[in-house]
């Protein structure tokens, strides 16, 4: 249960882990492992090895064994070494840990609820400041939105990092998937239309990802209709009751029905699972038209 900051917006360490019935080896930059973490790992039977030694160790394995490794996600050089070692039989299959992490335990759920409450406070404070500054006639941009959100989230003593780059998209920019405003290319907020804000943070006790659409003033009739129909999609998925053989794409279909009724659709996914103090996107669950992972309570 280690955390680091090796990856932007993701509190993970760059590492490999090799697990057998008799031992577990963590390949990591040992100089960055604190004495407390090292002692805890060793007490749980985990041996540390240098990050760059993974290829040599795998090539030197002589004990006949079957190794599970997913070719789609494992580093290709590592996968090649495994395949080229005659003592190893590679089983190309999905990482079973993903399914285990996808079902949160009661402790994780309790912490997630707490961090979402604090994150909601930051969101409310952001909205109040945004409304007040716009009402005062101040010129604000998509970059200003990012700055205000960071100010309120980072003020929390459990804040670690944004869970991804904030998507603050005004008007037509919101139609671009994963749009990101830059100092060279951004929009000025106006007192009309919609502002889309897709943002989140990782705290010591959880990770958040929340999307909200704010009307900044006068709306067209189409904007009102599309907003209302999309809201109905969210209400339907929140009220959905499913059986134990229901998978992700079945729920995704339920969510889209209010829009399909009008022969329109949204091109993005309906939602996705979020890790516990980790990746903002965590498999295997994701509500879209392709995912057949079974839902679990």
Task: Show which residues each predicted segment covers.
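Active-site neighborhoods and metal-handling regions in enzymes and metal-associated proteins
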Residues: 1-297
């Amino acid at each position: 249960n280690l955390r680091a900051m090796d990856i932007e917006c993701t509190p993970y360490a760059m590492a490999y882990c090799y697990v057998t019935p008799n031992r577990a080896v963590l390949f990591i930059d040992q100089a960055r492992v604190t004495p407390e973490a090292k002692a805890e790992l060793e007490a749980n039977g985990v041996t540390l090895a240098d990050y760059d030694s993974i290829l040599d160790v795998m090539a030197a394995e002589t004990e006949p064994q079957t190794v599970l490794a997913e070719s789609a996600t494992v580093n290709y050089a590592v996968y090649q070494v495994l395949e080229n070692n005659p003592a190893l039989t590679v089983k190309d299959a999905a990482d079973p840990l993903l399914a285990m992490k996808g079902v949160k335990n009661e402790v994780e759920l309790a912490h997630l609820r707490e961090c979402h409450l604090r994150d909601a406070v930051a969101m409310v404070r952001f909205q109040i400041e945004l409304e007040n500054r716009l009402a005062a006639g101040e010129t604000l941009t998509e970059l200003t939105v990012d700055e205000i959100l960071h100010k309120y989230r980072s003020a929390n003593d459990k804040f670690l990092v944004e869970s991804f780059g904030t998507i603050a998209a005004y008007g037509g920019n919101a139609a671009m998937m994963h749009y990101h405003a830059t100092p060279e290319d951004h929009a000025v907020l106006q007192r009309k239309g919609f502002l889309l804000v897709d943002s989140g943070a990782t705290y010591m006790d959880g990770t958040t990802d929340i999307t909200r659409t704010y009307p900044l003033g006068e709306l067209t009739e189409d904007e009102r209709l599309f907003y209302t129909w999309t809201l109905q999609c969210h209400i339907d998925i929140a009220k959905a009751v499913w059986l134990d053989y229901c998978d992700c794409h079945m729920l995704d279909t339920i969510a889209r029905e209010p829009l399909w009724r009008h022969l329109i659709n949204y091109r993005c996914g309906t939602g996705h699972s979020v890790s516990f103090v980790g990746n903002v996107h965590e498999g295997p669950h994701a509500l879209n038209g392709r995912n057949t992972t079974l839902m679990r309570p």
